[in-house]
UniProtKB/Swiss-Prot annotation:
This protein is located at the 30S-50S ribosomal subunit interface and may play a role in the structure and function of the aminoacyl-tRNA binding site. Pfam families: Ribosomal_L19. GO terms for cellular component: cytosolic large ribosomal subunit. The lineage of its organism: Bacteria, Bacillati, Actinomycetota, Actinomycetes, Micrococcales. This is Large ribosomal subunit protein bL19. Belongs to the bacterial ribosomal protein bL19 family. One of its GO terms (molecular function) is structural constituent of ribosome. Keywords: Ribonucleoprotein, Ribosomal protein. InterPro entries: Ribosomal_bL19, Ribosomal_bL19_CS, Ribosomal_bL19_sf, Translation_prot_SH3-like_sf. GO terms for biological process: translation. The gene is rplS.
Length: 117
């Protein structure tokens, strides 16, 4: 373990839920405009996660008014108010960059079924 890893451990957040590529998430982001602050919700599916520790990021994509919008969020950033997992997706890849070229029904992600036990 490096010296910086022990320093970074102090800044890691512990309120981040488990989510993976293909999951639909709502990211509540704190937006500060002048003197006012508000929370903006960005809902989309996770295209991938990369990095580790403080430097870990994830990419969320949504289609807004027919135009694809992607945002990259640092997982442990203080501008993120909270992350909600809406649905779990069933995908076979760690990075879903191929979804950029899909439109309509081809862009759907199967929902992971709960175990029937």
């Amino acid at each position: 373990m490096h010296i910086l890893d022990s320093f970074d451990k102090k800044t890691l957040r512990d309120d981040i839920p488990e989510f993976a590529p293909g999951d639909t998430v709502k990211v509540h982001v704190n937006i500060i405009e002048g003197k006012t602050a508000r929370v903006q919700v960005f809902q989309g599916y996770v295209m991938g996660r990369q990095g580790y520790g403080v430097r870990e990021t994830f990419r969320v994509r949504k289609v807004s008014f027919g135009i694809g919008v992607e945002r990259v969020f640092p997982v442990h950033s203080p501008i993120i108010d909270k992350i909600e997992v809406v649905t779990k997706g069933d995908v076979r890849r760690a990075k879903l960059y191929y979804m950029r070229d899909r439109h309509g029904k081809a862009a759907r992600i199967r929902e992971k079924r709960a175990d029937a036990k």
